[in-house]
């Protein structure tokens, strides 16, 4: 369970409700408007049976439409995923969960996003920076998309400022955990 993974590294036990409340309050302080969770069964998307991610209800706005609540949004989206239901029960798959999200509709980008996430995890949740592991996009040669060196540098700076040395490891497969 994702919440357990987060909780076992905190200074004190936090419920899912407390994590949600703290996240939304943190984002509100950063100028985000809190929007409600969309319906679990999408109203205007005939391509899917269920809302399966936090971004799914926001796709029109991520593609350029103007959102009535502004350019900074935050939510706790209820999600249901059935496409990998055979995998439920391992350490990576679940069917129903809430996805916390903060969304910039052309307002800010990686630098603010990464710093805010790091501050939320370390200052609000109480995670030790030494216990946080991050990933960066390694690129896709076939698609001609380069490695994201910018995000790697941003994370490196945040960890270095707190005296945490970084390491680089290849991502394991699901079978390897």
Residue ranges: model-predicted function:
Residues 4-10:
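Short, positively charged and aromatic/hydrophobic N-terminal segments
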Residues 13-177:
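Structured aminoacyl-transfer and RNA-binding surfaces used for tRNA recognition/handling
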């Amino acid at each position: 369970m994702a919440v357990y993974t987060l909780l076992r590294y905190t200074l004190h036990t936090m419920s899912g409700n407390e994590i949600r409340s703290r996240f939304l309050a943190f984002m509100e302080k950063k100028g985000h408007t809190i929007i409600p969770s969309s319906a679990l069964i999408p109203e205007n998307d005939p391509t899917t049976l269920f809302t399966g991610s936090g971004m799914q209800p926001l796709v029109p706005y991520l593609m350029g439409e103007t959102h009535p609540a502004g350019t900074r949004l935050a939510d706790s989206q209820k999600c249901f995923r059935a496409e990998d239901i055979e995998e439920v029960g391992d350490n990576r798959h679940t069917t129903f969960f809430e996805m916390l999200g903060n969304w910039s509709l052309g307002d800010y980008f990686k630098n603010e996003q990464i710093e805010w996430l790091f501050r939320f995890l370390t200052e609000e949740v109480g995670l030790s920076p030494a216990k946080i592991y991050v990933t960066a996009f390694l690129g896709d040669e076939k698609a001609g998309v380069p490695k994201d060196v910018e995000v790697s540098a941003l994370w490196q700076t945040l960890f270095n400022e707190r005296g945490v040395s970084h390491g680089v490891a290849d991502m394991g497969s699901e079978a390897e955990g």
